[in-house]
Design a protein with these regions (language model features):
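Conserved small/polar residues in nucleotide/adenosyl-binding loops
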Residues: 1-2
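Interfacial juxtamembrane loops and adjacent helix segments
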Residues: 7-8
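Active-site region of glycoside hydrolase catalytic domains
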Residues: 12-319
Length: 320
């Protein structure tokens, strides 16, 4: 069931977590929703397909911000919100084959996306009302896309892929619904069910800073109209010959992180917090039960060097 009152034991637990952070000089940055949906919200409302979930999210945000605003200065609304394009249920709690309104996959996805962006804006507004000194941001899985060749159509595909990433940022950072997906929506017969009140909320609920995870870059290859999203996860048929790959086929691209930082700062001019970057590797313990993690050390060093270069470029990076 969906409770009317919060779980005090759970709230008290995070009081202790934040107190412990401050004890050691750690400034917490808190993600409000990180892929952890109450089962009842998924079963009864199909996650963010329902606008009732927006109201529940508002209630949740008010609860935690009022409780922790003296302990938490930095808030993120959702984790990797754009992953809803590729893993809808994980990101939004909405299952594609359980639409309450019988929507097809494309329509459901973008209705859910709109509801999440609306919920994000409402969360930012609440943070500003309750704790004017606090900052509220957004977070996406940031991808750098390279055209597969110098063929002009591949660059068109690159722009399309990047715009599907920027769509989330443009709404959350600029407070406007961009034009560039209009043609795609028309081709896919996707209807935008936005009210004037929705548009006004998006304008008011703009993020103070932006944040992202970065794990790899990807290759854009044109395959005809209507264009298809290259995606966020790797495609083994489009490996970059200039980059090494992980055992799972993810490109290792430290320079891509510098590119990502410059792209975002040029477009939005907002401070940036890098929420995640890392690598998966096969590891084994030696006879002393130790893991000599030199590969990961080198990976992190290479990416930190590129963050430093981006800062020299003039990008305002305030945390990693």
């Amino acid at each position: 069931c969906i409770r009317d009152r919060p779980n005090e034991e759970g709230l008290a637990f995070y009081d202790k977590v934040f107190d412990e952070c401050h004890k050691y000089g750690i400034e917490p940055l808190v993600t409000m929703l990180h892929y952890d949906f109450p089962l009842a919200v998924c079963e009864k409302l199909n996650g963010f397909e329902s606008r009732e979930t927006i109201a529940l999210f508002e209630k949740y945000v008010r609860t935690i911000v009022e409780r922790y605003h003296k302990k938490v200065k930095y808030w993120l609304t959702f984790n990797e919100i754009n992953m809803s394009l590729q893993s809808l249920s994980t990101c939004s709690g909405a299952m594609r084959d359980h639409s309450l309104k019988g929507l097809d996959e494309e329509q459901l996805t973008f209705e859910v996306v709109h509801n999440m962006l609306l919920a994000s804006a409402k969360a930012v507004i609440l943070v500003h009302e309750i704790a004017p000194e606090a900052l509220a941001g957004n977070m996406v899985w940031k991808h750098v896309y390279y055209p597969k060749t110098v063929r002009p159509e591949d660059t068109l595909q690159q722009i399309f892929d990047m715009n599907l990433n920027y769509y989330f940022y443009d709404i959350q950072c600029k407070g406007v619904v961009p034009y560039y997906l209009d043609r795609y929506f028309e081709q896919k017969n996707i209807k935008r069910n936005y009210s004037p009140e929705d548009i006004e909320t998006l304008k008011k609920g703009k993020a103070d800073f932006l944040s992202f995870s970065y794990y790899m870059s990807n290759i854009s290859e044109y395959q005809g109209e209507p264009m298809k999203f290259t995606g966020l996860l790797p495609d083994q048929s489009r490996n970059n010959p200039y980059l090494k790959m992980t055992d799972w086929g993810w490109s290792i691209d430290p320079v891509g992180l510098r590119i990502a930082l410059n792209q975002l700062y040029t477009r939005y001019g907002l401070p940036i917090f890098i929420a995640e970057f890392g690598i998966g590797m096969y590891e084994s313990m030696d006879s002393n039960h130790q893991i000599h993690d030199q590969g990961r050390i080198e990976f992190v060093e290479a990416h930190l060097k590129q963050i430093k270069e981006a800062i020299k470029d003039g990008v305002d990076v305030f945390g990693v």
